[in-house]
Amino acid sequence: MAALEGPLLLPPSASLTTSPQTTCYQATWESQLEIFCCLATNSHLQAELTLEGLDKMMQPEPTFFACRAIRRLLLGERLHPFIHQEGTLLGKVGRRYSGEGLIIDGGGVFTRGQIDTDNYLPAVGSWELTDDCDKPCEFRELRSLYLPALLTCTICYKAMFRIVCRYLEFWEFEQCFHAFLAVLPHSLQPTIYQNYFALLESLKHLSFSIMPPASPDAQLHFLKFNISSFMATWGWHGELVSLRRAIAHNVERLPTVLKNLSKQSKHQDVKVNGRDLVGFQLALNQLVSRLHVKIQRKDPGPKPYRVVVSTPDCTYYLVYPGTPAIYRLVMCMAVADCIGHSCSGLHPCANFLGTHETPRLLAATLSRIRYAPKDRRAAMKGNLQACFQRYAATDARTLGSSTVSDMLEPTKHVSLENFKITIFNTNMVINTKISCHVPNTLQKTILNIPRLTNNFVIRKYSVKEPSFTISVFFSDNMCQGTAININISGDMLHFLFAMGTLKCFLPIRHIFPVSIANWNSTLDLHGLENQYMVRMGRKNVFWTTNFPSVVSSKDGLNVSWFKAATATISKVYGQPLVEQIRHELAPILTDQHARIDGNKNRIFSLLEHRNRSQIQTLHKRFLECLVECCSFLRLDVACIRRAAARGLFDFSKKIISHTKSKHECAVLGYKKCNLIPKIYARNKKTRLDELGRNANFISFVATTGHRFAALKPQIVRHAIRKLGLHWRHRTAASNEQTPPADPRVRCVRPLV
């Protein structure tokens, strides 16, 4: 069995009319495109069965072709009974028919005669001047256009109206309809009106959304999927377990409430009884900052997406943001039993449209047809990558690992003009909140405190291992949340260790996400021999009166320079910290008067990199003297760097004492006096870091080596000449601490 090729104009014959279909479940979009192309252009769709292929076929005369398709759609679908003499043509099978019909022979010639058959040729009525007809135009009669695509499906008038709106505006559609209605005989006008309203069937059921109306079950599953997807963006913190469980339980148990809330207008308040919603919202505010909702006790006025929470004590007002629109719905489902309307039926104000809004929305829909973008395949592909990037920028779960490592990275390495610098994290000031367990005993705990002001520190703890301090602030309900302030230094593992230790002496149930309030870093310039350059002769610095440092301020950030070329930087970390240091050190290291010893810079930067700690006073002095002695004796200074690379001068941060012990502890050895500021020598106390922890050989040589009166001036003279500072021979054994007259050799004086 084979189908008759088409589209083909059938000769006038008896036919049966069919009712227009607005819902065709078996009709595919490709078949509707093929039918429309045949109605408009009298030819098959040569290209792909897509909108782009249809555009190519309609390109010569889109308005004329679209109007011809409208006229044929208004005449409707028809069925012509036929018989094929050879019995090989395929047709639609229907009821038995006896009467005049079409007889088709083996050569495809049509004749009319009496037939008895149940086969029909599907066609569409046509009243066109362009039809291939032997009669003059004034003697036109209704013809039929046979379409092979109608053998497997029917015409879906909703789909046809969507395709028509692609090529015509609505006023053009109306003009085409009325012009065609004026030339038709009165006998065809009822059919025309019936098919006209079938085309406009989609305008009877208006919707705010772009998506077509879904079935109730599909809409309920769609809401559940959106709720689950939205909750998945919150992260998986233990404090949100009860909130997730309450939402999931109520969504499955109370689907009617879910439907009511989804249909509720954004300008209508949701009334809730009880304070559970306030507790859930406080926890979510702490954990997901992008979803923060302000909880107010004063009425904020008429605002969209408002929730009114009534408690025995007072009334709370929560105004949810419009994006995402499902936010208020999800939070209200957590307390679905406490919502102040009936759970059995729809809410009285849960309808989308009022009676007076239908004409306005219909006019807006017709106006939107005029300016709507065409649904071409290229335009239908959204840029999902850009959407994901915008979402990822605000989602706490997608915080990049590189950002976390920058925040908790203990060291940063910078190379500027082949000068190596290591930046150390001194400490971080971290703010967060904790929720505590309810005490089960009558003993005094952290929770048994009187009512105080909110900014009052009620407890302060200092931990030795791992080293950090914590301050606990007052809170009205410490079981729900209290603020803590942590001062700590170290990497991510050190921080997690500290948080675990914190749970050993505080009744902590959950720790909320932390935020770094301040960040302090420090660095030493190793190898810069004239260290006074960082604090003298500069116009962009100012001295502080209450601290012995000079502050350089650039781009709103301060760099404090202490003696011996040591600097501290606050409020910045990661790559911005590196850029700030580059801008700060570039004028110093590139100055023509700067004297830099590359060997010392490589040795000390290597030790800092190996030991992950700043070089202490005794280490610094010992290695400075060792380097100068090797240089004075014409020995290879590079051997010291090779020895440092093999670990000969390594030290550990753990051997540094954490307390300022008395001077008696200092005589026990290096292990005890490394960071102790004073030692007991020659019946007096002497500060080790009086000249600065990073003081170089030129700075501290005047205060040491008193027993080598003959050798010391020679080594000092050699060091000054090596640096090109034009040493004047004024230093003798008797007055070796007297500063030179030449201002260019001020570096031999101790820097204060």
From Swiss-Prot:
Q: Which residues cross the membrane?
A: none
The cross-references to Pfam families, in alphabetical order and at most eight, read: Herpes_UL87
Give the signal peptide as a residue range, or say none if absent. Answer: none
Q: Which InterPro entries match?
A: Herpes_UL87_C (IPR004285)
> What is the annotated role of this protein in its UniProt record?
Plays a role in the expression of late viral mRNAs together with ORF34.
What is known about its subunit structure? Answer: Interacts with ORF34.
Report the family membership: Belongs to the herpesviridae UL87 family.
Protein name according to UniProt: Protein ORF24
Q: Which gene encodes it?
A: ORF24
